[in-house]
């Protein structure tokens, strides 16, 4: 696990070599002041079945061992009534264990839960039932589900897609209307209401492994995602294509699949955000 400064030099205490077999880090690190000590901690999970809390000096504050591969990016959420953040881990196993622990490694009440579904990339966090506590949304491989795990461990299977989900879902609050979006292996990008009904479907020509990116411009929310058909898609909150979208960045190549999530910046100071993504062929 690497920590570098703005010139690419390793920070003191980094890199950290994880121990054990299969110590690959597939997901991203997440960071916050988990225990309210005034310092930022990093959380990473690994295929070696461990999750680590690491401080900004490279010290491992917690090494939590699970029973399953932890391939997905962990999440931070407030699942209970204290002021500390809890750590959520997603197992890549047929039992579909979802762990939630405190910063000292103890389990959050009612966790872990088993959803009997493999989760590859991670989950989304939001208070869906307005009780002041966060809930978890995941998209799964086995039965092609979008599911909600509420703060008390209750599971609600919200929607069944046409094929496996291998991406992280996203949650949109559109003036009080909750929409969950995710793409699947069939190339379908779904917008799902909180009651499980479909708000929209966008059909692409390839599998969708890209998580969604969001940008607001001219008082309108733009939703962007890539597909393995080589197109970058831009849609509005109703699933309609934005003017000028989708954009084909693959040309005649069959290798320019877009599996990276888009990011946004006003690169030329014209008050219009640019969309930045990367292709599997190595193009930005």
What kind of feature is each model-predicted range?
Residues 1-284:
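Extracytoplasmic/lumenal domain signature
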């Amino acid at each position: 696990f690497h920590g570098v400064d703005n010139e690419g030099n390793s920070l003191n205490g980094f890199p950290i070599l994880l121990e054990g077999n299969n110590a690959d880090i597939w997901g991203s690190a997440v960071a916050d002041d988990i225990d309210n000590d005034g310092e930022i901690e990093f959380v990473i999970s690994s295929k070696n079945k461990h999750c680590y809390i690491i401080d900004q000096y490279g010290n491992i504050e917690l090494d939590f061992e699970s029973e399953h591969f932890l391939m997905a990016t962990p999440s931070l959420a407030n699942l209970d009534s204290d002021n500390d953040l809890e750590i959520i881990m997603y197992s890549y196993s047929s039992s579909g264990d979802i762990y939630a622990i405190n910063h000292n490694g103890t389990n959050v009440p009612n966790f872990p839960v088993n959803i009997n579904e493999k989760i590859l990339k991670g989950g989304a966090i939001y208070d869906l039932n307005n009780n002041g506590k966060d809930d978890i949304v995941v998209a799964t491989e086995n039965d092609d589900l979008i599911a909600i795990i509420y703060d008390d461990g209750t599971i609600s299977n919200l929607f069944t897609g046409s094929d496996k989900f291998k991406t992280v879902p996203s949650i949109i609050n559109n003036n009080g209307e909750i929409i969950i979006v995710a793409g699947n292996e069939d190339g379908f990008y779904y917008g799902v209401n909180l009651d499980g009904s479909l708000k929209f479907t966008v059909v692409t020509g390839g599998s969708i492994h890209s998580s969604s990116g969001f940008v607001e411009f001219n008082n309108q929310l733009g939703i962007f995602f890539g597909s393995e058909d080589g197109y970058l898609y831009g849609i509005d909150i109703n699933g309609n294509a934005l003017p000028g979208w989708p954009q084909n960045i693959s040309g005649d190549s069959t290798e320019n699949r877009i599996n990276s999530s888009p990011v946004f910046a006003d690169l030329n100071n014209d008050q219009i955000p640019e969309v930045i993504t990367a292709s599997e062929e190595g193009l930005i």
